[in-house]
Every structure is written in structure tokens, then in C-alpha cells.
Amino acid sequence: MFGCLVAGRLVQTAAQQVAEDKFVFDLPDYESINHVVVFMLGTIPFPEGMGGSVYFSYPDSNGMPVWQLLGFVTNGKPSAIFKISGLKSGEGSQHPFGAMNIVRTPSVAQIGISVELLDSMAQQTPVGNAAVSSVDSFTQFTQKMLDNFYNFASSFAVSQAQMTPSPSEMFIPANVVLKWYENFQRRLAQNPLFWKT
């Protein structure tokens, strides 16, 4: 039903079922993992109104599991990428794996998936720094940066009559900055990653 992928490692598709509605994947040598992908295999969908809460567990200094909610997978969003590199310290959160008798070893973390009602999942709050930045947030940042630059540069605009001749300084016409701004916005709207080519 589920798969788990870590860069540079084989895909895991044999989750250990620890309860009727709970599954775990072992992540050996978890200290070297930055991101993990959790996905549905496409063979069995969730029942109507259900989804999977995805948790990350690592052993604390006493070897006790610390569980943190990463996010969710659903029939409508069958895969998700989570950043776990910053989660290996900190406090755990409420989780459904507490009473489970799951075999653990010191350098092994786990990804847990709990099948739950979509309504109850919507009321849970994943740990903040588990989400991977998306193109949308990058696009928003770029748009804000463009606006800020244009507003800053425009605040220095003067007409030719107001200019004081200064042979050592170069001046850029405001319409050139506006043309660049509009061109950059157009290209960003067409392809948010155009600047990489």
C-alpha cells in the first residue's frame, strides 16, 4: 500500500504492519538522511474519507522513540517529500504509535503511517520545518524581491530637469528598470525555474 524512498537507497515497499491501521518503515543510519519521500503504491487506495498521517521517529539520548508528525498522504495527494534533517532533535508530539511494541535499534529511525479519518487529520499540525520548500514559495519570494527592488529603485527617480550633472555617476532610465521588471515577471510566470538555464 505504501512506499518509502531515501536518496541513494533502494525503495522500500514492504512496510511492517504493526496494527490494523498502522505501518512503519525502518530507516537505518538515519543520521545521514536529509529528505524522505512517502508515497502510495497505487495498488490499494484509502477507503473513502480516510488518509494517512505520516510520522518520523528517532531514538532520543535514552533510546526512547520521539515521534513527530510530518504531514499526510491521501488519495488526492498520494506522495509527499519531507525534510527530516532538522528534526533529529526537539520534542515529540502526540502520536498513535505510543503503546506499540515496535522493535528498535539505536541507529534506526522509523517512518510511521497511521490510517485515519481525513477530518481528524485536518485538525493535526505537522512539525513546522518538515515541509520541503516548493516552487510556490520560491515564486512568492521572487515576486516580493522584484517588487521590493522596483519600489526601492523607483524611490530615487527624478526627472531630467531635477538631475544635477555628475560626470562620475551613471544613470539608468526608470523605464529600463520597469521593462526589466515586467520581462522578469513574465518569464517567472511562464517557468519559475527559467533562471537555472
UniProtKB/Swiss-Prot annotation:
Keywords: Cytoplasm, Disease variant, Leukodystrophy, Nucleus, Protein transport, Transport
GO CC, any one term: nucleoplasm
Entry's disease: Leukodystrophy, hypomyelinating, 13: An autosomal recessive neurodegenerative disorder with infantile onset, affecting mainly the central white matter. Clinical features include early feeding difficulties, global developmental delay, postnatal progressive microcephaly, truncal hypotonia, spasticity, and variable neurologic deficits, such as visual impairment.
Protein name: Protein Hikeshi
Stretches for region Flexible linker region involved in nuclear import of HSP70 proteins: 124-134
Signal peptide: none
Region (Required for F-X-F-G repeats-nucleoporins recognition and nuclear import): 18-55
Family the entry assigns: Belongs to the OPI10 family.
Mutation effect (residue 77 to A): Decreases nuclear import activity of HSPA8. Does not affect the dimer formation. Impairs binding to HSPA8
Subunit structure: Forms an asymmetric homodimer; required for binding and nuclear import of HSP70 proteins. Interacts with ATP-bound HSP70 proteins. Interacts with NUP62 and NUP153 (via F-X-F-G repeats). Interacts with HSPA8.
Induction: Following heat-shock treatment.
Keyword Transport: yes
Record carries keyword Transport: yes
Example GO molecular function: Hsp70 protein binding
Additional remark text: 'Hikeshi' is a traditional Japanese compound word used for a firefighter, smokejumper, or troubleshooter.
Subcellular location: Cytoplasm; Cytoplasm, Cytosol; Nucleus
Domain of life (superkingdom): Eukaryota
Stored PANTHER family: HIKESHI FAMILY MEMBER, PROTEIN HIKESHI
